[in-house]
């Protein structure tokens, strides 16, 4: 059965997220490690976390995908912004130890005019600083759309980050500690043709990064055509991936959820819905396509 869910709010606690996930047919989900605008994190209630762990074990959930706030920019041109990202990421990873074996996804950041090479070096520095030997959380670099000066649009850029960590801190670079989250909207907006050549794109990922690094999928439709570098998510079937009137179609979505390189990974929806019913419908629909 396809492992799929959506972003859920931590407002009512960890166990409540698990109950909500079950209520909409999800067997994984994503959550922000703190307010998505950044700032301090709530104190952990370990009994609440244990309650979630019980739900995960009892319900046969796949791995969860914790998401760092969008405000983190470990390759910012501003030193204080970099320091904030490092401090918060380090704290996030320590807190994730209360829920071992899960995934921690973050946007690599934007170099803001320093250049891609400088941005990659700063991201490598950040990972070498915040990760620690023996951690039980796998850190994921998210594929980006290439908006502005974002780092991580190409598979080559992601590979360079991973290789940089492996060169400096090989004990932190195992596939159980450092990987990639593939966002379908982002890679399409970034220029990869997953509508007509998904097999070719996945073969390229394997050649450049290695499929063993791929740990999760953000499954989103896109409001923009391939190569737009916009990063504007659309509901499933409403955009350039799933809408036949825009050159996509159901066959594209089916190919994604059944692809041998993807089908066993946790899928997370980040589509624009106002209520959980929209996500429940997409979960059921995509699970039906997966067979």
State the predicted function of each range:
Residues 1-68, 72, 76-91:
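N-terminal pre-domain/capping segments
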Residues 21, 67, 96, 104, ...:
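Conserved, mostly hydrophobic/aromatic
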Residues 7-11, 34-36, 69-71, 109-111, ...:
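Active-site beta-loop-alpha junctions enriched in small/polar residues
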């Amino acid at each position: 059965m396809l492992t799929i869910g959506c972003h859920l709010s931590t407002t009512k606690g960890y166990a409540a997220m698990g109950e909500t996930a079950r209520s909409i047919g999800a067997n994984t989900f994503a959550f922000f490690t703190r307010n998505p605008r950044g700032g301090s994190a709530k104190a952990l209630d370990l009994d609440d976390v244990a309650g979630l762990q019980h739900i995960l074990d009892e319900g046969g959930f796949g791995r969860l995908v914790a998401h760092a706030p969008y405000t983190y920019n470990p390759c910012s041109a501003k030193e204080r912004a970099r320091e904030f990202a490092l401090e918060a990421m380090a704290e996030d990873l320590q807190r994730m130890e209360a829920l071992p074996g899960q995934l921690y996804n973050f946007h690599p950041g934007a170099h803001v005019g320093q250049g891609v090479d400088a941005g990659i070096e700063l991201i490598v520095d950040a990972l070498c600083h915040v990760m620690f030997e023996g951690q039980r959380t796998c850190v994921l670099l998210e594929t980006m759309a290439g908006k502005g000066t974002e780092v991580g649009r190409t598979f080559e850029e992601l590979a360079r980050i991973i290789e940089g960590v492996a060169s400096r801190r090989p004990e932190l670079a195992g596939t159980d500690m450092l990987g990639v989250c593939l966002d379908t909207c982002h890679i399409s907006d970034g220029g990869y043709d997953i509508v007509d050549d998904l097999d070719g794109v996945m073969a390229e990922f394997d050649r450049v990064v290695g499929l063993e690094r791929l740990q999760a999928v953000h499954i989103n439709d896109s409001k923009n055509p391939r190569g737009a570098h916009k990063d504007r998510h659309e509901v499933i079937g409403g955009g350039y991936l799933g809408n036949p009137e825009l050159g996509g179609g159901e066959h594209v979505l089916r190919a994604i959820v059944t692809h041998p390189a993807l089908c066993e990974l946790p899928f997370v929806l980040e589509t624009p819905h106002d209520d959980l019913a929209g996500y429940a419908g997409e979960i059921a629909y995509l699970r039906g396509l997966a067979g």
